[in-house]
């Protein structure tokens, strides 16, 4: 007998046509008689009993609870200070009193609230080929593709680039003696290596002049400076802004405190008074937005965010509670193993 997979894939079916002549119709699409094609593969379905479910629930709780504790402790160890400056008149000066020292690497962020960078038309309004140096490629950038007045391509093009965040910050430490020291900051480590190395490149330079390379383009309408004056496509703030956020409340890294240039900040930011000066240029009132400046450290789990730790604690606690409930139900209404074995013998 031939193997099952060797069954022919075509079958002849006999019949009588309208003219009374016997005809044969060949069926060519018959699947092979294999277990996979005939959906006859062996299957296994676990039998859920009290002796398997209850230990499993307790194991889940025992795993999730310590993970939640570690995540919550890591988040709680992060030092963070937030100051809102939405309605502060530019130039705006705000006094910040750090209650404790921010040890280690200190990161400076800006927060935006009620800003939907995830809007479909907004996210698609960009051209990654242009950001690699192809200045004339403005596909998908409408309405910020061609300047109506000069008929030149806009570079960088697109709605995301046109709406770049342009507030500027300076942070200074004021000692008890009244001496004011500027906090040194750096852009090293602000952007991802994949963005810097593969996604954003300036066009080839003409005689080493970036402005000559951008000569046949025009700046986005909302930009106050020409791109060549701020580093072109390789501008750090531009690259950070182009990585769009998924939620309407987001935080983007602005700078990192430079711990190598001044001994006062070698261990981070010392406790004390700071003066934050803001050039408040970015309008958010039209859509009910809010702007904040954030000073933060990090831990092995990232920045300050207790949600993940709380989520693990809640799931772990629910698993333990459900395990106890299942034990009570099993002891009160369940059957013993002897009873189950007797029932099995009766049926056999």
Swiss-Prot record:
General function of this protein: Probable chaperone protein for the phospholipid-transporting ATPase tat-1. Regulates cell membrane structure and function. Plays a role in maintaining the membrane phosphatidylserine asymmetry and the formation of the tubular membrane structure. Involved in membrane trafficking and is specifically involved in the recycling and degradation of endocytic cargo and this is likely with the phospholipid-transporting ATPase tat-1.
Phenotype upon gene inactivation: RNAi-mediated knockdown results in the appearance of abnormal vacuoles in the intestines and defective recycling of endocytic cargo with the accumulation of cargo within abnormal early endosomes.
Full protein name: CDC50 family protein chat-1
Membrane topology recorded in Swiss-Prot or TrEMBL: Multi-pass membrane protein
Chief location of this protein within or outside the cell: membrane
Segments passing through the bilayer: 53-73, 309-329
One Pfam family recorded for the sequence: CDC50
Keyword Endoplasmic reticulum: yes
Record localization: Cell membrane; Early endosome membrane; Recycling endosome membrane; Endoplasmic reticulum
InterPro entries documented for this protein: CDC50/LEM3_fam
Family per similarity comment: Belongs to the CDC50/LEM3 family.
């Amino acid at each position: 007998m031939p193997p099952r997979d060797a069954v022919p894939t075509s079958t002849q079916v006999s019949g009588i046509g309208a003219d009374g002549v016997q005809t044969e119709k060949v069926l060519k699409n018959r699947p092979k008689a294999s277990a996979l094609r005939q959906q006859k593969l062996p299957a296994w379905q676990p039998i859920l009993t009290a002796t398997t479910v209850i230990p499993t629930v307790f194991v889940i709780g025992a795993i999730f609870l310590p993970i939640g504790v570690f995540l919550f402790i890591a988040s709680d160890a992060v030092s963070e200070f937030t100051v809102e400056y939405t309605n502060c008149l530019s130039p705006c000066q705000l006094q910040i009193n750090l209650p404790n020292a921010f040890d280690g690497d200190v990161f400076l962020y800006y927060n935006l609230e009620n800003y939907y960078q995830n809007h479909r038309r907004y996210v698609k309004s960009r051209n990654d080929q242009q950001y690699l140096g192809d200045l004339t490629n403005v596909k998908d950038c409408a309405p910020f593709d061609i300047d109506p007045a000069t008929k030149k391509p806009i570079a960088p093009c697109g709605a995301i680039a046109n709406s770049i965040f342009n507030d500027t910050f300076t942070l200074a430490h004021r000692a008890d003696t009244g001496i004011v020291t500027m906090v040194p900051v750096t852009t090293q480590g602000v952007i991802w290596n994949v963005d810097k190395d593969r996604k954003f490149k300036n066009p080839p330079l003409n005689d080493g002049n970036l402005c000559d390379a951008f000569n046949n383009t025009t700046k986005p309408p909302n930009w106050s400076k020409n791109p060549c004056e701020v580093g072109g496509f390789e501008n750090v703030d531009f690259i950070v802004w182009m990585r769009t956020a998924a939620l309407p409340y987001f935080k983007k890294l602005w700078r990192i405190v430079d711990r190598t240039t001044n001994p006062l900040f070698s261990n981070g930011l010392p406790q004390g008074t700071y003066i934050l000066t803001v050039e408040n240029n970015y309008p958010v009132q039209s859509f009910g937005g809010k702007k904040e400046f954030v000073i933060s450290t990090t831990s092995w789990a990232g920045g300050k965010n207790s949600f993940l730790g709380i989520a693990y604690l809640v799931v772990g606690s629910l698993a333990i509670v459900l395990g106890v409930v299942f034990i009570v139900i099993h002891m009160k209404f369940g059957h013993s193993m002897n009873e189950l074995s007797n029932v099995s013998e009766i049926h056999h």
